[in-house]
């Protein structure tokens, strides 16, 4: 093997973020809220994403993982690798490579030279395979993760050729994927946090090996991503669950802040612009609204047909919520969770505002034009429905959140506005002009009918909670106001 890792200088990094508890002795794993005993690295009985999580080996970095336990699993992985089809996919290689390097760094004083040599031989071979299988067919976060892994591995192995290639790819992908307002172009707050974590890892590795030019470049994007995170998070430091986002996967905002501070970074909030999201706030109300186009135009796999969707919190507690995501399996549930009716916006003729299909595919997309944008009000329109334009105005004043919808055009098809409540919201009374709940009231003008339907929301994978959804049928114009009871 052509690499150089001096025994005394395995990659030292400032303390990284510990991973979620997934492994339980002797061989039980919990991923995506699904528990299973280890059978093989290729076990897809819980779905492909579960098998991928097993092969990422994030769990080597969970707080209670001992060196002895982790070593046994690394050895087992190396032994089983010739028959491990899933583990040799490029995305698991990328994530696992970083985790192995962190694990070795954490326990470098305990790793015997013969064992380290065996681990390094396997790790280097895996990274060279990744180098040949970069995910240009998927692009997006997958290719960026590939670049992260090769960059960190190139520093660990002191491999200049790999470093030059990884640095070039990393710069190209960061320049393309991180928008000027600091957001990741796939518009998922969850993936933003995941990618920020490993970008911090890259910066961490770089500063500890004195790569000054690359350090400055990485710092630029890290600070930008931190600035966006400060702008989009709720007051309680949780993320909005927009597009493909769920809790229990990415590092928390507080963990990311603490990691950045350990790296002596400083940042300030950046105004949201290119991401398409906006924040409207008053004393008791906090709303995040979506008035953006699909920014990852060639890779919208994590995007939903959610134009003009919003989430609303009252006194930091969820009131109107996105229905979230519970699965990546190509099922009817996955199709619904990406559909327009699963979001707090309008359908015309029971159609989606953008075409979603195949679990991660998107066809024709709505095109958005922002008409006005101020601190307390934003108005935009989109052309996602055939024969008409949907205009929506969001306004927040004196703890009243107002939504005005207008359908412009010759299309007289039935329009439906959906409002999805958080699971703990109870509908106390309903009429043609008012909806009363245990936390707030909604006054409605322009409705032909209002109906309560039973629904589910998901804040974590494979966990559906019963909830109520309001379905408002209208013709051309609808206004509703949300205010505290």
Where do the protein language model's features map onto the residues?
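Extreme N-terminal leader/anchor segments
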Residues: 1-37
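Short acidic-hydrophobic surface loop/beta-edge motif
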Residues: 29, 278-282, 310-312, 426, ...
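Aromatic-lined, polymer-binding surfaces characteristic
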Residues: 47-222
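Residues that flank catalytic or metal-binding motifs in active/ligand-binding sites
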Residues: 55, 146, 276, 306-308, ...
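CBM-like, beta-strand-rich accessory domains located in the C-terminal region of large
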Residues: 94, 140, 328-485
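Carbohydrate-active enzyme catalytic cores, enriched for enzymes
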Residues: 179, 183-321, 325, 372-377
